[in-house]
């Protein structure tokens, strides 16, 4: 991984709640921790590969890292986690603001709008569009990782 990317994610990777996300499965056999890191890295690579200008890399990566910072096992429907796909962006933002109260408007928008079109309101910023695209790409990766595991 590039130094620029590592320098931005290091503060978040040290957070104890973020570390605990490695214990909860997101999709397939991939933890929420690994999924979030993958989304952030794919978003970073997307910007670099396409040589996009006027992208706030710092906000892009931080928003991507925190987009699924909801801190619960969404598979446990009986614990009140119904409609997870619609609701978790709000829980993720609420939790992220407790630890990172300095989140800017782009980072907040990335977290809140990454589930578009499921959550109806589209992203507002280029950075949020990139993250929501890379989140879908990472989810397919997570899903097919599960399929590979089953075939073995």
For the regions a protein language model found, what residue spans apply to each?
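Metal-dependent phosphohydrolase cores
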Residues: 1-152
């Amino acid at each position: 991984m590039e130094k620029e990317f590592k320098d931005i994610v290091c503060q978040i990777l040290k957070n104890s709640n973020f570390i605990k996300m490695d214990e909860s499965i997101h999709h397939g056999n991939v933890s929420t921790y690994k999924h979030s890191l993958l989304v952030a890295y794919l978003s970073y690579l997307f910007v670099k590969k396409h040589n996009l200008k006027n992208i706030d890399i710092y906000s892009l990566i931080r928003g991507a890292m925190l987009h699924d910072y909801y801190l619960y096992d969404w598979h446990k429907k009986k614990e009140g986690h119904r409609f997870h796909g619609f609701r978790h962006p709000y829980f993720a933002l609420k939790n992220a603001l407790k630890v990172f109260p300095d989140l800017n408007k782009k980072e907040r928008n990335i977290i809140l709008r990454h589930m578009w079109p499921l959550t109806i309101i589209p992203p507002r910023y280029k950075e949020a569009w990139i993250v929501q695209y890379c989140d879908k790409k990472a989810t397919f990766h997570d899903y097919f990782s599960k399929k590979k595991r089953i075939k073995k």
